[in-house]
Each structure stands twice: as C-alpha cells, then as structure tokens.
Amino acid sequence: FFDFDEWALVLGVLGDKDAEGIIDALAPVVTRVFTTQPESPRASDAEALADLVELRGLVVSAHPASDDAMDTARRWAAEGDRRAVLIAGSVVLAGEAIAYAESEGWKA
C-alpha cells in the first residue's frame, strides 16, 4: 500500500491497445499526466494521447521522447511532498523506464 497525496502518470500506449480504457481506469487517481511515445513503430502519438487525456479534464503535457516525459514527471514529483510517478500503458515503455532509471542512478 502506497500513501501518496498526488500521483502523476507517464503514459505511453501502443496503437493496438485500448488507450481510452487505460486512461479511464487511471484518471480517478492521477493529478497530472505526461504522455509519451514508446520506441516502437506501433506507438500511439504523444499528442493524440494528450488529446484523449484532456477530454477527461486532467492536466496533461505531451513529450514524444520517453526520457523527457520521465524527467519532467520526476521534477513534478520533487516539487511537492508526498508525490509519486506511475509509468503505464506499455511493456515497451516499462522497459524504457527501467533502463533509463538505471542509467540515471534513480532509486525505485
């Protein structure tokens, strides 16, 4: 069980997945969304994902490069107490996040 007051979401989805379903499932628990495009030819466009998120009334910004999305989300989390970042939408993005976190020396 995690006890954070605010959650940000880094979201990158492959085009054949249910992006709207993922957004609808996570929207009630996130404060901010950073959309991105995983390194895959099947990746959904970060701007198109941001448009879907915006329709749900959430604060969102698009970051085509996943490392930029993760850095921006991490800075957002550091600006307040009890903030956390969730990375979701694609196993490809999860792999990129693990590799990037290791290269940056981030703790889990």
Feature locations, PLM:
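Active-site-proximal loop/hinge segments that shape catalytic or ion-binding/gating pockets
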Residues: 90
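Alpha-helix N-cap/loop-to-helix initiation residues
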Residues: 15-19, 42, 94
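Active-site-adjacent alpha-helix immediately C-terminal to a catalytic or transition-state-stabilizing loop
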Residues: 95-108
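Nucleotide phosphate-binding/pyrophosphate-handling subdomain across enzymes
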Residues: 1-32
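Short helix-capping segments at alpha-helix termini
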Residues: 2-6, 54-58, 105-106
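C-terminal helical cap/extension that packs against the catalytic core
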Residues: 20-84
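Generic beta-sheet signal
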Residues: 7-9, 83-87
